[in-house]
Each structure stands twice: as C-alpha cells, then as structure tokens.
C-alpha cells in the first residue's frame, strides 16, 4: 500500500497533481518548484535527500529535455538525473511522463512506469488538445469557425474529439482517414468522410486544416493545392505530418502545436495525470 508520494520537478500540472493527491489522503512532498510550491496541501521539501524518501516518486512530463537534467523549470538549480537515480530508494515506485531510453537506462533496476503512455490519459488529453487547437485557429484566421470548412486529417483520439467540437461550433467538417472503418464512423457522425488518397481533391476549399497523424501526409503535391489564405495546424508529435520546408517555400501559414494540454489547460492536464497515476497505484497495490 502506497502512502507517501514525492513530486519532483515539473510545472503547474505537477503542482495540481500534488494538491489533488494530498486531498485524497496521500502524504505528499514536492521538490523543485521554488516559491511556486508554497501550499497547505503538501510539504515543500528543500532537501532533495529527504524529498526522495517516499513510496512513490513522480517525475514530470517530459522527464527530461536533454537526457541529463530533470525538467524542472521553476527550480533555480539544475537537478541531475544521474544524481537523482543514485539517491532514490530501490524499492520506490518511479513514475514519469514520456520517458526516454536514456532515463530507463539510468533507472535500471527500479520499478519505473511511463504514465503518459496510458490509454486513459491519452484519451482524456485529446480534449484539451482539441480545444487548444481550436483556440489557435480562432486566433489565426479572420473568419469564424462557424461556416468555415475544416479538414481534420486522422480519426484517432484527437481527431474524434476535434471533429465533434468543430461540428458543435457550426463548421463544415471534413475528416480524412486511412481505415475504412474510421471513415464509416466519420460518416455516421455527419462529417464529410474522405480517404487520405482523396485529400488533394478537396484541400483547396479548406479554411483550416488540422493534422493529427505523425507521418507525412501533407506533402508537396498536396501543399501546392492549398489556398494561401488557409491555416495549417499540425497537432502530431515528431516528425509531424507536414513538409514544413515546402510549406514555408510556398508561403503557407503552418503552426506546429505540440504539448497543448500543458500549455492551454495545465490544471485540467494535472487532474488527468492525477487520475491516471491513481489508477496505476491501485493496480500496483
């Protein structure tokens, strides 16, 4: 049974997570947040040696940006991952988001779980991602979403939520996908369903194009057909789904909008992480 939790590094998402876990009865400490960590809900630890003395160690998302230092933007000093891995108890459960191979190697011998790979988190994160994408579209286009033609490329978690929200705002929603089963669902929900091979035939009349597929879909052939007044918003993780250099050469407006949950809705994102970690703790016993 896990009782003590230490949240080390991160941003407002992790502070939200710490507060919520405390409210559920866990004894929570935080480290690596500076003055932003003051709260009656948890203990703001100043000594990293004491901070790591917990049943559960929760690291940020991503754990690191360079495979050497912990991602701790609020902390005045560098927290070396090697130092951290050396002082955490071997019997602690270590949780982190978007854990790289280098981090897994450092924590060899530990029970370490990537909470950002959990399906429930990815599904719920689709909502702040979709809302953030629409917010960007509203700020980058001179027209309303209502009555706009919007193409959503890909009908996975984000594509499903995004299409529904756009439809609710009155957009004329086109959905492209590779699988015919996805196209069938898109048709059932009242969208204009097109196969990825047919994107080039409808791309010119789109006002906003949202890509959710992390593979090259919007290549040179398709980009040449896009209206110069359109906006392309790429929500896919690296390498993205747009030929960015060709789009730049053509003078197209492309926004690669990564990590929207943490930027647009950090408190909601923190709540989603908390719910996911609570599920993990129940499973791990």
What do these predicted ranges mean?
Residues 25-40, 169-189:
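NAD(P)-binding Rossmann-fold cofactor-contacting core
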Residues 98-113, 236-279:
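Rossmann-fold NAD(P)-binding glycine/threonine-rich loop
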Residues 2-4, 91, 146-149, 229:
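Phosphate-coordination loops involved in phosphoryl transfer and adenosine-cofactor binding
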Residues 62-66, 79-91, 186-261:
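Rossmann-like adenosine-cofactor binding region
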Residues 59-147, 257, 276:
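Glycine/serine-rich phosphate-binding loop and adjoining beta1-alpha1 elements at the start
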Residues 43-50, 193-197:
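Short acidic-hydrophobic, aromatic-tinged amphipathic segments that line or gate anion-handling sites
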Residues 11, 34, 100, 178-179, ...:
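Residues in the short beta-alpha loop(s) of Rossmann-like NAD(P)-binding domains
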Residues 6-15, 21, 146-166:
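Glycine-rich adenosine-cofactor-binding loop
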